[in-house]
Structures are given as C-alpha cells and as structure tokens.
C-alpha cells in the first residue's frame, strides 16, 4: 500500500509543476512529458506557464441549478513575461491553447477586452484596453472565483485540452460552455462507447 501511495505521488504530478499550494494536479497537464514539450518548442510552439492553486471547491458537485452554483476563490499568478507573450500572440492573430480548465479560468480571469478605452476589470468582462484585440494582464497572487457557464464570453482562450470530467461538476459546465452542449454530449457518448478513460488519469480531448 505504501509503495502504491509513493508511486501515485510521482504519477500525480506534472513535469512542469513548481509552486506548492494546490489540492489537486491540473490533470490535463499529466499528458505532457519533457520530450513532448521539447518537440512542441522545436516546432516553434510557444509554451508558457501560469499558476492557479486549485481548491477543493472546484470539485464540489452542482447540487441545485447550474446558474446558482458558486465556486470558492483560488489564488493565481501570471507573470508579466508570460502575459507579454500571450498578448503578442493575440495581436498577431495566433491561437491560444489552454491546457486544462484551471489554465483557462486563470487566463479568462485576467482578460481585458479590446475596445476603444479603459483598463478592464480582469474578470473576463473588462472594459476596453485601447487595442483592437483582447489582452491578458499580469497577476501576482490575486484570487478568482470565476465560474464559467453558458453565455460566458471567452476573450483569451481559443482552444482547450481537457480530460473527461464528472457529471454535475463545474468543470463539465465549463467544457460545455466552451464548445457547446450537443458537441460535448456527442463526444462523451463516443468516449463511453470506445471505453476511453475518464477523470484524473484518463484520456484528454482537444476542443478547437
């Protein structure tokens, strides 16, 4: 039993983890190895890292209605260097891929909407930035309780890599909001039929 627990500690960790503080790993990141990251970089894919300390509330089932569900606050960090790379990509019309729902929530929490003026609120629905494109601001340990549900306007993230999630979870609501409900239902039905693995150590999907 101790051997299994020790092995799990190694397996339940991304190769790029640096800062302690989360109660769970960003499981979409478990699919990435050092060699895969090196291969992506060799293909001139920009790989940037952000931090969001996942709290236990993320996994709290939706008890009543989707609309009334609340998320607990979680601390997150986006360096100025990373924000600059993302903003340059947005300016150039490049696509931003988020690895995991935690990354998406952090980026959308720090999003500033491109418009004529203003500084933005950093909640995903900010005022204008003075640019013709959406941007993300640097964040140093602020908290977010952003709950992504149908109707959310995605300002930064264009594509998402994510695992298959539990029913009645805020994570599944986020995924269905990012794609659309019918597409996600179809994907999950196919995953069940083909016996894909679900949850933390499971398979992942790419939503373009």
Listing of model-derived features with the role each one plays in the protein:
Residues 124-130:
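Compositionally biased low-complexity segments enriched in histidine and/or tyrosine
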